[in-house]
C-alpha cells in the first residue's frame, strides 16, 4: 500500500470511533414485575425496621421500591426510565378489600413510574372488571401510562366491550414513545398465549 494512503486511513480509524462515541447517550432503566399488591414486603411486619437497612429479613415492599427509584434518580445524571411489566394487582388483602379502586396504579405514578403493561392477573376479574379498575384509577387521579400491544377484541361477544372502550379512550395505548435526555424511547407490552385461562390457549 502506498504511504500516501496509510496516513489518511490511520487518521480516519482514530477519529471515526470518537465521532460515534461522542453521540453515545446513557439511559438507566428501573424495571419491576409481579408486585401483586404486596405493599408491605415479605416477612412479618414485626421484623421490619424502617429507619435502618440490613437489620431485618424483610424484602420488597412498595415503600422500599419507591426509595430505590428516588435515590437512583438523584444519583444518576443521565435520564431514568421506570417501568413495570405487569401483575401489579392481585395477591394480597389490600387489593381484595378495595379491588376496583385501583390505588396501586395511583401509587405507581406517585413512585415515579413512567409506564406499565398488563399481566395475566390484571384480567382475573375478567375484561369488565379490568375496565372498571382502569376507569376508577383514571378518575381518581394521575396514573402511569398503561401500554398493551396485542389485545384482540371479540366481534361476536359484548363481554369485552367495556375494555375495548378503555382502549379507544386512550387510557390504554398500544405503544408509547417517550423522550428522555434527547433519546426517543419506544415502549410496548405483550402478553403471551400461555397466559390465556382457557383450554384453547395454545390455538
Outline where the language-model segments fall.
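Short amphipathic alpha-helical "recognition" segments used for binding
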Residues: 6-7, 22
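Acidic, metal/ion-coordinating pockets
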Residues: 21-203
Amino acid at each position: 500500500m502506498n504511504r500516501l494512503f496509510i496516513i489518511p486511513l490511520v487518521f480516519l480509524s482514530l477519529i471515526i470511533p470518537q465521532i460515534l462515541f461522542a453521540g453515545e447517550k446513557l439511559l438507566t432503566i428501573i424495571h419491576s414485575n409481579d408486585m401483586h399488591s404486596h405493599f408491605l414486603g415479605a416477612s412479618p411486619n414485626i421484623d421490619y425496621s424502617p429507619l435502618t437497612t440490613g437489620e431485618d429479613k424483610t424484602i420488597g415492599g412498595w415503600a422500599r421500591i419507591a426509595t430505590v427509584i428516588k435515590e437512583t434518580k438523584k444519583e444518576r445524571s443521565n435520564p431514568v426510565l421506570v417501568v413495570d411489566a405487569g401483575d401489579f394487582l392481585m395477591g394480597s388483602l389490600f387489593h381484595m378489600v378495595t379491588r376496583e379502586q385501583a390505588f396501586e396504579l395511583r401509587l405507581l405514578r406517585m413512585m415515579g413510574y413512567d409506564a406499565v403493561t398488563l399481566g395475566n392477573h390484571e384480567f382475573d376479574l375478567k375484561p369488565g372488571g379490568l375496565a372498571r379498575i382502569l376507569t376508577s384509577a383514571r378518575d381518581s387521579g394521575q396514573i402511569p401510562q398503561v401500554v398493551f400491544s396485542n389485545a384482540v377484541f371479540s366481534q361476536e361477544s359484548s363481554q369485552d366491550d367495556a375494555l375495548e372502550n378503555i382502549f379507544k379512550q386512550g387510557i390504554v395505548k398500544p405503544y408509547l414513545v417517550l423522550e428522555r435526555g434527547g433519546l426517543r424511547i419506544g415502549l410496548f407490552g405483550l402478553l403471551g398465549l400461555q397466559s390465556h385461562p382457557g383450554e384453547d390457549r395454545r390455538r
